[in-house]
Amino acid sequence: MSTKTEKKRGGGAAVVVIVLCLIALGALGYVIWRQFCPAVPDTAAGYVASAGTTAPVYDEKGEQLGSLVRGAEVQYVAEDVESGAERVRVVNGEGYVYVAPANIAADYSGAVLTETVYALRGMSLVDETGVTPGCAVEKGMALTVTGFDGLDEAGQVLRWRVSCDRGEGYISNENVRLTQEEAAAQYDAEAYAIHAARGDAWGGGDAADLDYYPTEKGPIPGNDMPDEVRALYLNGSAIQYADSYLRVAAGTGINAFVVDIVDGTAVSYASPVMQQYSPSAYAAAQDTMENFRANVQKLRDAGCYVIGRITVFNDAHLAADHPEYVISDLDGTPLKISSMYWPSAYNRTVWQYKTDLALEAAALGFNEIQFDYIRFPDGAYKYEQAGTIDYKNTYGESKAQAVQRFLIYAAQRLHDAGYYVSGDVFGECANAYVTACGQYWPAISSVVDAISGMPYPDHYSAQGDYKPWEHPYTTVHNFGESAMARQSETASPGAVRTWIQCYNAIREPYNHYGAAELADEVRALRDAGCTGGFMTWNGASDIDKYREVISALS
């Protein structure tokens, strides 16, 4: 055997010895490490769970260190949960903090431990999309929590999924409280006592049962509402001649237009929403959506604030397409009341239809949606007395509750989309009672961005030889003073923006209403403190009448 071969064998043996020594040293080191250093426990991903917005955390001795936000993702020691330990270790940097086992959830869906919440205001639940309104809930009603839809950075629930004996659905966090006492309390007990004392004088509902909790309002970014709106009204035909009306308004004080989207049977454009809900309305359209959009845009391009008007619970087309939605006799035959058919204000599908339509139309260029005919029919008293009317009242609500709850639902959706909401009411509504048709000024003004009374002088009854339509200043001023008194009775009143009579009186002696009479109406409103503006009501949108009176509208 050569010397080279012997050297190779000797070198290989040395390598083996070295490797064996290293293995032995490693094993010895591991034994020593295990003896003096505890094993690193296995951790799992989880979420902080709590009935409140945070969960307390403790040190090893049980002293509270602070809190963790509900819903925060953490790493926790799995064996602490599995073994039923009194505290669960949660990784905190290079060490641990400790929480109660109940404050750890394996899934995000288990982060909210609240079992019951309470409705802050009377309203309707909605489905997961927030689009379809569901069952009514009453102020202070207990709602069983069945889930939630998101948490904010502070651990607050964004929306609660709840159920009650009437149904199930979603409700936003701002509309619930965690105790029945908090939910049932009135925001302003002194103001509430005023409403409660009024009761139910005319069958429209008890003022005590309406909601007076403030509605969050305010400027919408990118959508500026004038402090005083000075508007001409354009029906569905008139908007097709937008250029002509803009020439009339040019250089005057007019800064806005009210444009019909739908006015009873008069449909301004072929709406896809109408095609879905009411094909006969779609078929009756006076113009295409494209043309309608272009004409609305002309008003916007001229710097005008544009309001879209929708009649809600007066709809002959919907009544024809869906008679099951309509106020009827006890056999289900729709009743024609005051020469109209009335989809019930209790019907949630009607709510959704009109709000879907509002959102579709608003996207065509409107700043605001104005809801008209937000009421039950006048003229139903004889049917009520005879017990021969079916209002389709599923949840036992009053008329005024249905009107207010529709507005709460619609305003939430429209505000979320960046549009203002206004509501038209009878001039009578400025009085200190709930009207027979379900309108109560403080409850409506509390929800909308602007409330629009219709104190047309020729709509008031004569008192002997005194004819209110012969005294436009006095008639409108009296209304304005009453309206401002009602405004003081709610915590979040909308602007008072009033319809003024812009047509010749329809009652003897058929007074002419020209620039002087309209100037009296405008001055009366301002003198009474109704500073939100005015809108000219002329059903025909008579351009010659507008030319005649325009000097009074600056």
PLM features: residue spans?
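SH3/SH3-like (including bacterial SH3b) beta-barrel domains
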Residues: 58-70, 127-139
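Substrate-binding cleft of secreted/luminal carbohydrate-active enzymes
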Residues: 448-462, 471-477, 482-554
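SH3/SH3-like beta-barrel superfamily modules
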Residues: 67-100, 138-174
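Catalytic domains of carbohydrate-active enzymes, especially glycoside hydrolases
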Residues: 242-267, 363-368, 450, 525-532
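Boundary regions of SH3-family modules and the immediately adjacent low-complexity/disordered segments
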Residues: 39-44, 91-118, 161-219
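Aromatic-lined carbohydrate-recognition surfaces of secreted/lumenal glycan-active proteins
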Residues: 233, 305-315, 370, 397-436, ...
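Active-site-adjacent "subsite" loops/lids of carbohydrate-active enzymes
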Residues: 220-237, 313-360, 519
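Glycine-rich, aromatic-flanked loop segments that form ligand/cofactor-binding clefts
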Residues: 256-261, 287-335, 368-372
